[in-house]
């Protein structure tokens, strides 16, 4: 089985089941005769662009990113470690030296409701158009953590 076929199978599993962990995905693949290493599975999930969301009971589950309306690219989500909100502003935390990279990604995405960004070494201030938009973006980014 090649990479594309394996990733299609992963997408099918995610759409059919409420899957919460990579181990669950790996077990489903094994039941179908597909053996993958943890590293390969992690890479596949990142390339597919899966999001982790919370259901009504607060349990995490994987979802295909095309099923969730999000203005943020998978690259943006990759850098965010933590998100906090203060009114109409978001504070995004990254690894040391990555905040400016994240700022450039967000600025290049040209999201209409983001007025601007200010980056430090590991912290990024995102200024949103209003508080409701900031709340929505906070929820969106936190779901991917």
From Swiss-Prot:
It is found in: Cytoplasm. Signal peptide: none annotated. One of its GO terms (biological process) is protein complex oligomerization. InterPro entries: Arg_repress, Arg_repress_C, Arg_repress_C_sf, Arg_repress_DNA-bd, WH-like_DNA-bd_sf, WH_DNA-bd_sf. Pathway: Amino-acid biosynthesis; L-arginine biosynthesis [regulation]. Keywords: Amino-acid biosynthesis, Arginine biosynthesis, Cytoplasm, DNA-binding, Repressor, Transcription, Transcription regulation. Gene3D superfamilies: 3.30.1360.40, Winged helix-like DNA-binding domain superfamily/Winged helix DNA-binding domain. Its main location: cytoplasm. One of its GO terms (cellular component) is cytoplasm. GO terms for molecular function: arginine binding; DNA binding; DNA-binding transcription factor activity. Pfam families: Arg_repressor, Arg_repressor_C. It comes from the Bacteria. SUPFAM superfamilies: C-terminal domain of arginine repressor, Winged helix' DNA-binding domain. Regulates arginine biosynthesis genes. NCBIfam families: argR_whole. Belongs to the ArgR family. This is Arginine repressor.
């Amino acid at each position: 089985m090649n990479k594309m076929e394996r990733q299609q199978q992963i997408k099918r599993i995610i759409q059919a089941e409420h899957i919460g962990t990579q181990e669950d995905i790996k077990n489903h693949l094994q039941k179908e005769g597909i053996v993958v290493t943890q590293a390969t599975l992690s890479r596949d999930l990142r390339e597919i662009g899966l999001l982790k969301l919370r259901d009504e009971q607060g349990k995490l589950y994987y979802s295909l990113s095309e099923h969730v309306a999000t203005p943020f690219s998978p690259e943006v989500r990759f850098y965010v470690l933590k998100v906090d909100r203060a009114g109409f502003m978001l504070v995004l935390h990254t690894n040391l030296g990555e905040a400016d990279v994240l700022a450039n990604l967000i600025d290049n995405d040209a999201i209409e409701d983001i007025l601007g960004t200010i980056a430090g070494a590991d912290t990024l201030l995102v200024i949103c158009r209003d508080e409701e938009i900031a709340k929505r973006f906070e929820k969106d980014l936190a779901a991917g953590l």
